[in-house]
């Protein structure tokens, strides 16, 4: 009987050690993944777009404070993702924040860059955004964004163009399941 108990105890400890070994491997893989990905995302965090949103002119409905916070968050995140997509010449960073014509335009721009072996950087982004229309049903907002940033175009690691630009964008955003998305992002000469 004692022999059976000792064998059962050894089997139990062996099973715990195997589980612990698997857990240790899983933790090691997770730490390695974080170590590899952290530099990529920390760069983005350091260069987050500066966005100031004014909803005072919006009508016919006023923008509620929680909605304003979410729109501001998602607009900033969209520009950070746009910057990543253009720099990496990949649509992977877009996270579904661009839909409709905005997504089509951005996908085409990324594909064109990739075909030509180029990439772009949108550095030191500042966006002064005015909400000019907020639908009575709360299902669409029109924004006017005066954006200024440093635009760099690169061929591999070599900068082939570098300029400070001021661009006016008309933006249409609509709510999705858990965020606001950009449906239209159109550069215009002036407001």
Residues of each region from the PLM?
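Bacterial N-terminal signal peptides
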Residues: 27-35
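Contiguous, function-dense segments enriched for cysteine-driven chemistry
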Residues: 48-49, 55, 59, 63, ...
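Short solvent-exposed beta->alpha transition segments
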Residues: 65, 91-136
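A mature extracytoplasmic/lumenal domain signature
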Residues: 69, 98-101, 109-110, 145-149, ...
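Polar/charged side chains located within well-ordered beta-strands of beta-rich proteins
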Residues: 75, 124-127, 145, 150-151
């Amino acid at each position: 009987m004692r022999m059976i108990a000792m064998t059962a105890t050894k089997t139990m400890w062996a099973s715990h050690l195997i589980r612990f070994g698997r857990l240790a491997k899983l933790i090691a893989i997770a730490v390695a993944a974080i170590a590899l990905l952290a530099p990529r995302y920390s760069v983005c965090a350091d260069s987050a777009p500066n966005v100031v949103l004014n909803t005072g002119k919006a009508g016919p409905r006023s923008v509620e404070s929680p909605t304003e916070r979410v729109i501001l968050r998602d607009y900033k995140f969209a520009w950070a993702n746009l910057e990543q997509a253009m720099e990496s010449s990949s649509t992977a960073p877009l996270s579904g924040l661009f839909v409709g014509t905005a997504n089509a335009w951005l996908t085409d721009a990324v594909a064109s860059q990739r075909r030509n072996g180029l990439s772009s950087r949108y550095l030191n982004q500042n966006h002064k955004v005015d909400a000019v229309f907020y639908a009575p049903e709360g299902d669409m907002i029109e924004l006017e964004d005066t954006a200024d940033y440093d635009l760099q175009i690169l061929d591999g690691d070599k900068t082939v163009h570098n300029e400070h630009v001021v661009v006016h964008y008309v933006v249409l955003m609509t709510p999705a399941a858990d965020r606001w998305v950009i449906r239209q992002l159109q550069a215009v000469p002036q407001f």
